[in-house]
C-alpha cells in the first residue's frame, strides 16, 4: 500500500481555506470539489490506455483512450457526496456506486445502511471518496464490501487523513493505495482528526 500526499501549491492553498472555521457552506463545497479534481488527476496517472482511430477535422487521427470498463466512483454517504462532482468533472463517464455508512459515536465503528454498486464492478477500478480518513473503520468496511462484490482494483481519495486511520487500512488492505491532500497530526479522544476540517458533512450540507 502506498500513501500519496499530493504536494502542490494549489492543493495547499485550497486546503488552508477549508480548514478555516468561518468558511461559508457554498465555498466549502466548491473547494472540496476543486481539491478532489486535483487528487483525481494524481490518482489516475497510471490508468491503462489503448490506441484507437477517430475522424479528425483533416482526416483520421490516432488517439489514446482509457482502456477497459474504466472507473466507478464510490462516495461514502453522506460527506463523500461533497467530492463527487469534482471527480465526475474529470471522469464524466464514471459509474457511481453508493455506500451509506455512519460512525457509531460510542464505538467509533461503522454501520452500513445502504449499498448500490455499479454493474460489472469486478471489471472496474473503484475510487472511494470521502473528505476524511479518521479511524479507518469506515474505509476498511467499504473496501471489504467492494472486494466481496468482486472488485479487485481499489484506491481512495481524501482531503485529510490521520496516521491512525492510514495504519488501520494498511494492516487490513495493503493492496489499496490512498491519495490525500494532507496527512494530519493525530486523532483526538473522540476520534476526530487534528487539526482536521471539523465536521465535513455538516459543512458541506449546512447542518449542525
UniProtKB/Swiss-Prot annotation:
Q: What class of enzyme is it?
A: transferase
Q: What does this protein do?
A: Catalyzes the conversion of uracil and 5-phospho-alpha-D-ribose 1-diphosphate (PRPP) to UMP and diphosphate.
Q: Which top-level group of life is the source organism from? A: Bacteria
The EC code for this enzyme is 2.4.2.9
Tell me the route in metabolism or biology where this protein functions: Pyrimidine metabolism; UMP biosynthesis via salvage pathway; UMP from uracil: step 1/1
Q: Which residues form a coiled coil?
A: none
Whether GTP-binding counts among this entry's keywords is yes
Q: Could you tell me what reaction this enzyme catalyses?
A: UMP + diphosphate = 5-phospho-alpha-D-ribose 1-diphosphate + uracil
Q: What is this protein called?
A: Uracil phosphoribosyltransferase
GO MF: GTP binding; magnesium ion binding; uracil phosphoribosyltransferase activity
Activity control = Allosterically activated by GTP.
Organism whose genome encodes this protein: Oleidesulfovibrio alaskensis (strain ATCC BAA-1058 / DSM 17464 / G20)
Cofactor(s), names only, from the UniProt record:
Mg(2+)
**What does the record list as GO biological process?**
UMP salvage; uracil salvage
Q: Which Pfam families match?
A: UPRTase
Q: Which CDD domains match?
A: PRTases_typeI
The cofactor remark states: Binds 1 Mg(2+) ion per subunit. The magnesium is bound as Mg-PRPP.
Family per UniProt? Belongs to the UPRTase family.
At which positions is 5-phospho-alpha-D-ribose 1-diphosphate bound? 78, 103, 130-138, 199
The alphabetized UniProt keywords are: Allosteric enzyme, Glycosyltransferase, GTP-binding, Magnesium, Nucleotide-binding, Transferase
Amino acid at each position: 500500500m502506498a500513501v500519496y500526499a499530493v504536494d502542490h501549491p494549489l492543493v495547499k492553498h485550497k486546503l488552508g481555506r477549508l480548514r478555516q472555521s468561518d468558511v461559508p457552506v457554498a465555498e466549502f463545497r466548491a473547494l472540496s470539489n476543486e481539491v478532489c479534481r486535483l487528487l483525481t488527476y494524481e490518482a489516475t496517472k497510471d490508468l491503462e490506455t489503448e490506441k484507437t482511430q477517430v475522424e479528425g477535422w483533416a482526416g483520421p487521427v490516432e488517439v489514446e483512450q482509457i482502456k477497459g470498463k474504466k472507473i466507478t466512483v464510490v462516495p461514502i454517504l453522506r460527506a463523500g457526496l461533497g467530492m463527487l462532482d469534482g471527480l465526475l468533472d474529470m471522469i464524466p463517464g464514471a459509474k457511481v456506486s453508493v455506500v451509506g455508512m455512519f460512525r457509531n459515536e460510542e464505538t467509533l465503528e461503522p454501520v452500513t445502511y445502504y449499498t448500490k454498486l455499479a454493474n460489472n464492478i469486478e471489471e472496474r477500478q473503484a475510487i472511494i471518496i470521502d473528505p476524511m480518513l479518521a479511524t479507518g473503520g469506515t474505509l476498511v468496511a467499504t473496501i471489504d464490501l467492494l472486494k466481496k462484490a468482486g472488485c479487485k482494483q481499489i484506491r481512495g481519495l481524501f482531503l485529510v487523513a490521520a496516521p491512525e486511520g492510514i495504519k488501520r487500512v494498511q494492516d487490513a488492505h495493503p493492496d489499496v493505495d490512498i491519495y490525500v491532500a494532507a496527512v494530519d497530526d493525530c486523532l483526538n479522544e473522540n476520534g476526530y482528526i487534528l487539526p482536521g476540517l471539523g465536521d465535513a458533512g455538516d459543512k458541506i450540507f449546512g447542518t449542525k
